[in-house]
Amino acid sequence: MAIMIQKRNGRKELLDITKIQKMSMEATKGLEGVSQSELELDAHIKFIDGMHSKDIQDALIKTAVEKIDIDVPNWTFVAARLFLFDLYHRVGIATHGVKGEAYCHLKDYIKFGIEAGRLIPSIADGYDLDELNAYIDPSRDLLFNYLGIKTLYDRYLIKNRKAEPIELPQQMFMAIAMFLAQNEKDKQSKAKEFYDVISKFEVMLATPTLSNARTNRHQLSSCYIGSSPDNIEGIFDGYKEMALLSKYGGGIGWDWNQIRSLGGVIDDHKSAAGGTVPFLKITNDLAIAVDQLGTRKGAIAVYLEPWHMDIVDFVDLKKNSGEERRRAHDLFPALWISDLFMERVMEDSYWTLFDPYEVRDLSETFGDEFKAKYIAYENDESITKDRMKAKDLWKKILTSYFEVGSPFLCWKDTANRTNPNSHVGHIRSSNLCTEIFQNTNPNHYKIKLEFEDGTVSTYEESDLVVVDGGVTKKANKVSALDSVNGKRVFIVEKEKIDGDTAVCNLASINLSKINTKEDIERVVPTAIRMLDNVIDLNFYPLRKVKATNLKSRSIGLGVMGEAEMLAQHQLAWGSSEHFKKIDQIMEAISYNTIKSSSDLASEKGVYPTFEGSKWSKGIMPHDLAPQAVNALVDKDLFDTSYDWDVLREKVKKDGMRNGYLMAIAPTSSISILVGTTQAIEPVYKRKWFEENLSGLIPVVVPRLSPETWAYYTPAFEIDQLQVIKAAAIRQKWIDQGQSTNIFMSLDKASGKYLHEIYTLAWKLGLKSTYYLRSQSPEAKNDVEDRSMECAGCQ
């Protein structure tokens, strides 16, 4: 009896077994350890009259996915190809493509995308689309493993209003390249250049750029960093700012250190202030209420310095016990730690807590200046203070870190001491993922007196104003009952002067593909050019954010795939060979990144605040690294391929296009997309499961073989002191920071070990550590938890 199947478009046709055989043959062709017959037999497809063609495709994909295992990892590519065949078909139906052709002409893709309201109408302006269409290489789709193509489909491919995909991977990459190259003089060749590095997975842009470049909503930045002043206007203006940034998908880092503490003075009334926690509770609710386009709740890290009198409550924010009104479970607390605090911990001496209302300048200083002011305030009997053993507070911090994974730790003095733009500002906090370190400044508020005759006068809050009757008042005490120079005051308001909110524009080099001197020299200039273009093409939710980004022209080029690269080269994690290899790679990336930005400065101009920067003085990131870091790498004094003195002179002469250059983000999503290991981290396990809308997907580390097996050491089996040392070697070469996670097995955990890890991080010049991930040695849960990760930096 003839069996009829129902196609996706509703049409019925006779079942043709040869089509299924042809598809399974194509899916398995050239892949070791898999076979066409095994796929077809194990699928157990029961052919029933009237069945849907989609059911056949789904059965084959499901079979291939379930067969992914340590000894047969190539089934992931079989599943990816089967998924791609289905995707080609679905996009063809949605866009009315030509039957039998996976990729329609670039012109047709763009026309359909614009008509659907998904592509920006100017995307093709000035391009030869026939030439670019011929340049697209559909065979690069075969680079995807199954989880990679599923991630691309779920998170990045443009869909129509019915949630049907209307673009294919190479169309997406070309459209992104065209968008980023649109202002280049030779945009045609630059679009090809950009397309090559991203479609070959040599460099990958961060999630917001991948998602939004080419669309009408081209918000391309990953994270934002801001600060709130200690007044009600500034705090609530900050809420509005956070809401708008979260609305457009940005992760947020926010400094709260200027907010007066619980029991502080308000308007000369003692014990009137509610402290930071009530305001952080509102921030917590804001993160939930203003989600990221309905996909996930907002993500906000909140920063405080350990001398703030609210520090104990702050450390307890995510604690599962205690008064719920004092908890903020959806925020990510982080500490902004001075060298002085760490020294007091090491000395086992006392630590003093202050109300920032009484010690305003502690937030504005670092290093020796901070230390001198702090000690002076300790000795000032007129200032309200509290004391506790520094080691007791440190123990509380580490206990919370171990129990709930936070607060993250960031080192204030190291961040500011190495700040290339310390001449024009101060670093007050990091971002959500603790890899971005840039100047920020809270909004400033002046007193505006509007008189009944319509005239206006403005004053600083502390300015003295003589009102009629001869009484002298501070400007912030003048009211509508007063007159000045015979003019009756109509209303007193505060006028906002925008501060600086920093922006992170990110991309990552895939070390599993780019790890030689020649390849680094080839791809880094392209990556820097793309990121620099992001600054000018970005949609900014707020004027002040755009102004800050144009002033510093900040970017963050990082890396991913370090663990895969080490396994390829058969280098053990934490070995001297690992340290030497990563030192060589990071030096090459640092040198070429700085050179590329300087080359761009010659072509397009320097960033506005270049003069006076460390760059302008020829000071490079590695010049500021602790001497102890150099001792970690076994190399001769003159063992370098690069002439840094020549580069110093070039930078002093030609300038820099970008004020901040390098930062290593977590890269969770984009490393999955390109099929490599996450950022700089050792692997979680050799095999684990990723949770997806489709269920649990087995994942095997890339290129696993008998030769690489021993070099994929699971993260929880590695001495975490070696993780810190590797991070210190990378940090030597980068001007910003890196997201460094620590992995702690419960059978190895102790207060002493945690203390050793984090004090070593401080001593070796790390600017931050991110999550502390703990695991029971007998844990059977092989599912990777990504619920706490920032979407933007990935």
PLM regions: where:
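Polar, glycine-rich mid-to-C-terminal structural blocks
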Residues: 316-317, 325, 329-397, 401-404, ...
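Internal maturation/activation junctions in enzymes
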Residues: 208, 215, 524-546, 550, ...
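Catalytic alpha/beta core of large soluble enzyme barrels
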Residues: 121-151, 437-438, 531, 535-536, ...
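Terminal amphipathic helices with adjacent charged low-complexity linkers/tails
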Residues: 75-116, 150, 337-341, 358, ...
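A glycine-rich phosphate-binding loop feature that marks nucleotide/adenosyl-phosphate handling sites
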Residues: 42-43, 61-64, 77-85, 197, ...
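Core nucleic-acid recognition elements
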Residues: 11, 34-174, 189-196
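Function-dense linear segments that define catalytic or interfacial modules
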Residues: 158, 171-191, 195-221, 225-268, ...
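Alpha-helix capping and helix-loop boundary segments enriched in small/acidic/polar residues
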Residues: 11-15, 164-167, 189, 208-216, ...
